[in-house]
Curated annotation (Swiss-Prot):
Cofactor section: Zn(2+)
Protein family according to the UniProt entry: Belongs to the peptidase M54 family.
Listed EC numbers: 3.4.-.-
Protein name: Archaemetzincin
Organism encoding this protein: Methanocaldococcus jannaschii (strain ATCC 43067 / DSM 2661 / JAL-1 / JCM 10045 / NBRC 100440)
Record PANTHER family: ARCHAEMETZINCIN, ARCHAEMETZINCIN-2
Superkingdom per UniProt: Archaea
Cofactor note: Binds 2 Zn(2+) ions per subunit. One is catalytic, whereas the other seems to have a structural role.
Amino acid sequence: MVMIMRICIQPVGDVNDEILKFLKKKFGEVFGMCEILPKIDIPIYAYNFSRGQFNSTLILKSLPTVEDIVLGVTEVDIYADNLNFVFGEAELFGKRALISLARLRPEFYGLPPNKDVLKIRALKEAIHEIGHVLGLIHCENKRCVMSFSNSIIDVDLKDWRYCKKCLKKLQDRGIYISI
């Protein structure tokens, strides 16, 4: 049984259209329905000049609140309080999540651009953050998509799917997804 839920992808600033379309396709397969909303501007007040990064919590709070889950996708480098950077942030049991593509890009680490690598990394972090919205916390299974990623190596090591334990937690809440 698959629960049909709608995920709205919210571009925050200019975001690579190919990545947005890839996420839309995969979310449709996993969650049931997905749409891409019109782009919104990056809130300038979220920029921290001394760090040269944007505060993820401020961007997250700027996302629209709708009945559906909203996943913000941005190209800017983000951080959260007490952390040098984050790949994303979400409201636990909320409606909003955010990912940044900045540190998911191979070129951030001095490597050649690779769209396929970027797509799978974006998918992993997006499904991870949506997991938080659905009530999942970090998983100890390093292969589970809900594993905490402290570096890009951690992102690359984990799968894009929830482990059996995390799937069971979702099912216990009446959430059935196709993954």
